[in-house]
Amino acid sequence: MPTAVIESLDHEGRGIARVEGKAVFIEGGLPGETVEYRVLRSKPNYEQAEATRIVRRSALRVAPRCPHFGVCGGCSMQHLDTLAQAATKQRVLEDALWRIGKVKPGIIYSAIQGPAWGYRYRARLGVRLVPAKGGVLIGFHERRSSYIADLGVCPVLPAHVSALLPALKVLVASLSIADRLPQIEVAVSEATTVLVFRNLLALKKADEAQLRSFAETHGVQVWLQPEGPDSIVPLHPRSGPGLTYTLPEFDVALDFRATDFTQVNVHINRLLIRRAMQLLQPAPGERIADLFCGLGNFSLPIARRGATVVGVEGSEALVARALENARRNGLDSRTEFHAANLFDATEDSLAALGPLDKLLIDPPREGAIAVVKAVGPAQQPARIVYVSCNPATLARDAAVLVHEKGYVLRGAGIANMFPQTSHVESIALFERP
């Protein structure tokens, strides 16, 4: 077996080594380690490989907590100390900002950290009936594969959800549509756990009875999703407490449905909002836009600080949820929400929002290139806070703001929203000089 010395980690958590002038990306290797490896794929300029033996160990290597680590693709960094994970993600962010955007933040914000385990309050579990593997499999995709990893436990899920996995497999195996049920959506709030079963075929009465019994036995709500995300309906109980998460620092509670987009990590979400408010500094009399606002996660805290908020979101269902959340929190007089496709934003559409003092952007992985290009003579907010879930698109958009629009990147830092994974969430502040 060939050997290599790992120099650093890439954005997927793989070790990077140089062997005879070629980059080798080695799964399972950590910086400073000498590893034996097996090549999985060879290209002219690089190779993909996996470590087969650790010859010299890093002091930052830890024992993975999950017995499925290495097979399940849900986590890629359980073998690395949690603090070192955050440091690695910070380096990934800084590298992307410079390599792609040719920008450097004035300061690096301290990493936003929270619980390393049991944090994942939302998850989409794949389901497959595979008789050759013993029946029903429930879990995330296997690493480098479309197959489903057969999970008995999952320590990044809340403990009570992880404990349900064996019983869920038995439940699905008992249903007449076991081979036509591709996923189970999990949504956990402070008082409620909802399981949404994606049923491609109608359930028989015996199936419904099994699901009701499961819901009662385990104290969860069972919903069905026969079509798209908006088709979900409760099976048992027919009516019960809804899903809500709270932001105590801002005296805000937000209602949501199981298939709505919300942050998976409630602890980090609260700290991220606190950081965003510290950077944005909303004040009474200001008019602030929250773009990609979802159901009001940032909008309502901004409004609670006294500013007027204009929220824009592509999903009409989420706009309706934001309007209702504003009303329930007594903030409807300081908020307005609109449905619009921000990927088609123009100078005119941004100007139509009216004069803006500041801007908060929280886009999906695709980033907000149309929005940042639309910042122009008619709309020049003094301060922009950008919350990102993809360093590459943040760096691309930062290049436009800094090199074309005249903003200064005052600071940037990561929020460890997904511990044990290579996912990098971050926040950045841009200001006019």
UniProtKB/Swiss-Prot annotation:
<feature type="binding site">
    <location>
        <position position="263"/>
    </location>
    <ligand>
        <name>S-adenosyl-L-methionine</name>
    </ligand>
</feature>
<dbReference type="InterPro" id="IPR030390">
    <property type="entry name" value="MeTrfase_TrmA_AS"/>
</dbReference>
<keyword id="KW-0808">Transferase</keyword>
<feature type="binding site">
    <location>
        <position position="341"/>
    </location>
    <ligand>
        <name>S-adenosyl-L-methionine</name>
    </ligand>
</feature>
<keyword id="KW-0408">Iron</keyword>
<feature type="binding site">
    <location>
        <position position="362"/>
    </location>
    <ligand>
        <name>S-adenosyl-L-methionine</name>
    </ligand>
</feature>
<feature type="binding site">
    <location>
        <position position="66"/>
    </location>
    <ligand>
        <name>[4Fe-4S] cluster</name>
    </ligand>
</feature>
<keyword id="KW-0949">S-adenosyl-L-methionine</keyword>
<feature type="binding site">
    <location>
        <position position="72"/>
    </location>
    <ligand>
        <name>[4Fe-4S] cluster</name>
    </ligand>
</feature>
<feature type="binding site">
    <location>
        <position position="292"/>
    </location>
    <ligand>
        <name>S-adenosyl-L-methionine</name>
    </ligand>
</feature>
<dbReference type="GO" id="GO:0005506">
    <property type="term" value="F:iron ion binding"/>
</dbReference>
<protein>
    <recommendedName>
        <fullName>23S rRNA (uracil(1939)-C(5))-methyltransferase RlmD</fullName>
        <ecNumber>2.1.1.190</ecNumber>
    </recommendedName>
</protein>
<dbReference type="Pfam" id="PF05958">
    <property type="entry name" value="tRNA_U5-meth_tr"/>
</dbReference>
<keyword id="KW-0489">Methyltransferase</keyword>
<comment type="similarity">
    <text>Belongs to the class I-like SAM-binding methyltransferase superfamily. RNA M5U methyltransferase family. RlmD subfamily.</text>
</comment>
<keyword id="KW-0004">4Fe-4S</keyword>
<dbReference type="InterPro" id="IPR001566">
    <property type="entry name" value="23S_rRNA_MeTrfase_RlmD"/>
</dbReference>
<dbReference type="GO" id="GO:0051539">
    <property type="term" value="F:4 iron, 4 sulfur cluster binding"/>
</dbReference>
<dbReference type="InterPro" id="IPR010280">
    <property type="entry name" value="U5_MeTrfase_fam"/>
</dbReference>
<comment type="function">
    <text>Catalyzes the formation of 5-methyl-uridine at position 1939 (m5U1939) in 23S rRNA.</text>
</comment>
<keyword id="KW-0479">Metal-binding</keyword>
<feature type="domain" description="TRAM">
    <location>
        <begin position="1"/>
        <end position="53"/>
    </location>
</feature>
<dbReference type="InterPro" id="IPR012340">
    <property type="entry name" value="NA-bd_OB-fold"/>
</dbReference>
<keyword id="KW-0411">Iron-sulfur</keyword>
<feature type="binding site">
    <location>
        <position position="75"/>
    </location>
    <ligand>
        <name>[4Fe-4S] cluster</name>
    </ligand>
</feature>
<dbReference type="GO" id="GO:0070475">
    <property type="term" value="P:rRNA base methylation"/>
</dbReference>
<dbReference type="InterPro" id="IPR029063">
    <property type="entry name" value="SAM-dependent_MTases_sf"/>
</dbReference>
<keyword id="KW-0698">rRNA processing</keyword>
<dbReference type="GO" id="GO:0070041">
    <property type="term" value="F:rRNA (uridine-C5-)-methyltransferase activity"/>
</dbReference>
<dbReference type="GO" id="GO:0003723">
    <property type="term" value="F:RNA binding"/>
</dbReference>
<feature type="binding site">
    <location>
        <position position="154"/>
    </location>
    <ligand>
        <name>[4Fe-4S] cluster</name>
    </ligand>
</feature>
<feature type="binding site">
    <location>
        <position position="297"/>
    </location>
    <ligand>
        <name>S-adenosyl-L-methionine</name>
    </ligand>
</feature>
<dbReference type="Pfam" id="PF01938">
    <property type="entry name" value="TRAM"/>
</dbReference>
<dbReference type="InterPro" id="IPR002792">
    <property type="entry name" value="TRAM_dom"/>
</dbReference>
<feature type="active site" description="Nucleophile">
    <location>
        <position position="389"/>
    </location>
</feature>
<feature type="binding site">
    <location>
        <position position="313"/>
    </location>
    <ligand>
        <name>S-adenosyl-L-methionine</name>
    </ligand>
</feature>
